[in-house]
């Protein structure tokens, strides 16, 4: 065997981990909105209808979850990051007597769409979490997975807003979020700025709950920051 070929191959393998994080992960591009806008949870609205998102229908371990197609779209302004979830479902599992004016802790015990966003690529275990339910309930948390036990600070408040609606005839629900960027990122928003992110859903009634994610975590815990993809601010 040619020794130079062996050395060259070894160098290539050693350099692979030095590739940028975004080259090895899924990417969602958040498109630049002309201005901030009111939430409608309507994918046909002017601010959303031309936006290309990402689609997933896979479980935590990458297996297909039929009849639960999930599309995530994103746009941004210098002040806010917007997310829109389009969620196909078979059945709804909703909290009785929902509150849309106060935070609902443990909202994940019912149907939700979730966004986990981290901005420190040197501290991937610190990130923030945002949830919206089909009822329009919400909860946001500051997460730090470094301590034992991990810190899930539900008292942290981003000031984000949500809007949701259910199309029962077509078995699709829609959830929108408007998140103040300055609350989770110290950097100035600009085209090309990247964040670490993953998106999730919990849907249906136990014991038949469905767990859908954009980037599969390959275990039973959504709090797996190593699996996050990239959210990139686009034009």
What are these regions (language model features)?
Residues 1-25:
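Bacterial Sec-dependent N-terminal signal peptides
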Residues 23-235:
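Structural preference for beta-rich elements and adjacent junctions enriched in aromatics
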């Amino acid at each position: 065997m040619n020794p130079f070929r062996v050395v060259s191959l070894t160098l290539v393998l050693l350099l692979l981990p030095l590739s940028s994080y975004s080259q090895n992960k899924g990417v969602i591009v958040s498109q630049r909105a002309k201005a901030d806008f009111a939430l409608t949870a309507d994918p046909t609205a002017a601010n959303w209808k031309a936006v290309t998102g990402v689609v997933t229908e896979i479980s935590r371990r990458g297996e297909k979850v039929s009849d639960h197609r999930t599309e995530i779209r994103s746009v941004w302004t210098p002040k806010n990051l917007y997310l829109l979830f389009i969620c196909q479902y078979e059945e709804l599992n909703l909290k009785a007597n929902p509150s849309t004016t106060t935070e609902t802790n443990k909202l994940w015990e019912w149907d939700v769409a979730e966004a986990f966003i981290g901005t420190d690529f040197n501290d991937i275990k610190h990130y923030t979490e945002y949830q919206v339910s089909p009822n329009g309930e919400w909860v946001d948390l500051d997460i730090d997975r470094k301590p034992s036990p991990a810190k899930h600070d539900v008292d942290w408040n981003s000031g984000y807003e949500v809007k949701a609606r259910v199309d029962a005839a077509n078995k699709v629900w829609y959830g929108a979020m408007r998140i103040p960027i300055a609350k989770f990122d110290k950097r100035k928003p600009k085209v090309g700025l990247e964040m670490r992110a993953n998106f999730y859903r919990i849907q249906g009634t136990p014991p038949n709950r469905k767990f859908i994610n954009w980037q599969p975590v390959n275990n039973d815990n959504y709090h797996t920051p190593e699996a996050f993809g990239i959210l990139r601010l686009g034009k």
